[in-house]
């Protein structure tokens, strides 16, 4: 996106966003562009949904194009995603490290979508989020990986400008996270998301992020700047 905002191994990055803000699609675009060994814990979408999106992002296909290609007998895409391991089974936060350790290829990036769907023995929301945030931080540090965790926040809280640290049950997330990013979207008259803004809410390192992105079908891209006329 033409921005300098480094994220380092050993860091927990939390993305706070309200429901239906395309947060999963955003991180799918990210990891697909990096194509680094990735463990993607997806607890909200079905395997069919998640892989359909990944293929569309990679190939730039519409749903109709994907359906036509899929109907062909020689359709094959697995080799394009040998860097990706998707897991759909929710687990306790403490079990995540064991799952990663058992992978044949150590991941460089771990995605958790989303934190609220992880299992916990705690019924109290504060204790649950404290446990999960602490475990994700441990995974990032012990395995020297980047952990990106999505955390849902209410629309009213986002509209009031509240950060994740001021939402009930989320103080420990803010305490543990190396970086906290907020995601907001704008829609057209038909209700389709057309743009999104990613901003830094907290960062232990130097640097801030405030970027406007354009939603182009299934891809999320930086807006193209109009060409300047040549002088003279």
Report residues per predicted region:
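Cytosolic-facing regulatory segments adjacent to core modules
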Residues: 2-4, 25, 29, 36-106, ...
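Pre-Walker A (Motif I) flank of P-loop NTPase domains
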Residues: 8-13
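Flexible beta-alpha connector loops of hexameric P-loop NTPases
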Residues: 85-87, 119-130, 159-165
């Amino acid at each position: 996106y033409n921005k300098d905002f480094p994220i380092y191994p050993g860091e927990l990055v939390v993305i706070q966003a309200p429901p239906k803000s395309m947060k999963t699609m955003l991180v799918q675009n990210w990891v697909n562009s990096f194509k680094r060994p990735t463990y993607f814990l997806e607890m909200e979408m079905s395997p069919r949904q998640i892989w359909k999106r990944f293929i569309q992002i990679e190939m730039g296909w519409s749903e109709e194009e994907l359906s036509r290609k899929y109907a062909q007998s020689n359709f094959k895409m697995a080799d394009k995603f040998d860097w990706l391991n998707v897991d759909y089974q929710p687990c306790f936060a403490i079990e995540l490290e064991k799952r990663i350790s058992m992978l044949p290829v150590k991941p460089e990036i771990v995605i958790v979508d989303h934190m609220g769907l992880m299992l916990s023995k705690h019924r109290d929301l504060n204790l649950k989020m404290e446990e999960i945030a602490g475990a994700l931080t441990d995974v990032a540090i012990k395995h020297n990986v980047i952990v990106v965790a999505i955390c849902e926040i209410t629309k009213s809280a986002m509209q009031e400008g509240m950060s994740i640290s001021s939402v009930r049950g989320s103080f420990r997330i803010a305490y543990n996270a190396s970086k906290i990013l907020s995601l907001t979207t704008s829609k057209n008259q038909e209700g389709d998301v057309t743009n999104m803004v990613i901003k830094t809410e907290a960062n232990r390192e130097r640097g801030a992020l405030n970027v406007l992105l354009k939603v182009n079908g299934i891809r999320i891209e930086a807006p193209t700047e109009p060409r300047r006329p040549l002088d003279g």
